[in-house]
Regions:
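Walker A/P-loop
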Residues: 18
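Conserved phosphate-donor/acceptor-positioning beta-strand/loop module used by diverse small-molecule
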Residues: 113-135
Length: 193
């Protein structure tokens, strides 16, 4: 069976991962199965936070990482591995901050995803862009991020490129090219290379 690629679209919340994922899905043939963290787990996370007496916007921090995020990412990983094992490419969309900033962790995670071709697409952003985008989308899940914006942006490592091999899509205010142009160039370069 041919290698079913895994595409990982990562970056901070509000960076534009969903937009980039949509552009990739439109350009890739065959189109991969989309595994978006918010779509897969959004309502579950809201219910789990409520059941635990946590605030609805708590999507960062030690408690969330231990009791929620670990299970979200484990479920996404197992689902991706299973889908790929049947020859279907996948596209995972989530921040994946810890996985992309540690080269050995990335290698281990890529193996858990089923090995083979695992491509990281990093959506680059900065504090000004994130603040504008998070404010504009007005989602309750962003409340804690905006309330503790300085700590949130520090935890996202905005100025640190991923330690894992990656392709960058620049979605900062004033980026030199549109997302459409950047994704088109990326897909063309991978097809040629």
């Amino acid at each position: 069976m041919p290698d079913a690629a895994a595409w990982v679209v990562a970056g901070p919340p509000g960076a534009g991962k969903s937009t980039v994922a949509g552009l990739l899905l439109a350009a890739l043939r065959p189109p991969p199965a989309l595994l978006d963290k918010d779509t897969m787990y959004g309502s579950f996370v809201a219910a789990a936070l409520a059941a635990a007496g946590r605030t609805p916007g708590e999507r960062e921090g030690a408690w969330y990482d231990e009791h929620i995020k670990a299970h979200e990412y484990a479920g996404m990983t197992a689902t991706a591995r299973q889908v790929r094992s049947h020859g279907c490419p996948v596209l995972l969309s989530a921040p994946f901050t810890q996985q992309i900033h540690d080269a050995s962790r990335w290698q281990s995670w890529a193996a858990e995803l089923g090995g083979g071709t695992v491509r990281l697409i990093w959506v680059r952003s900065d504090a000004a862009t994130l603040h504008r985008r998070l404010t504009a989308r007005g989602s309750g899940r962003d409340t804690a991020k905006l309330d503790g914006f300085t700590a949130f942006t520090a935890s996202m490592r905005l100025d640190a490129e991923p330690a894992a091999p990656h392709h960058t899509i620049d979605n900062r205010l004033g980026a030199g090219a549109t997302l459409e142009a950047q994704v088109s160039t990326l897909v063309r370069s991978l097809a040629d290379g």
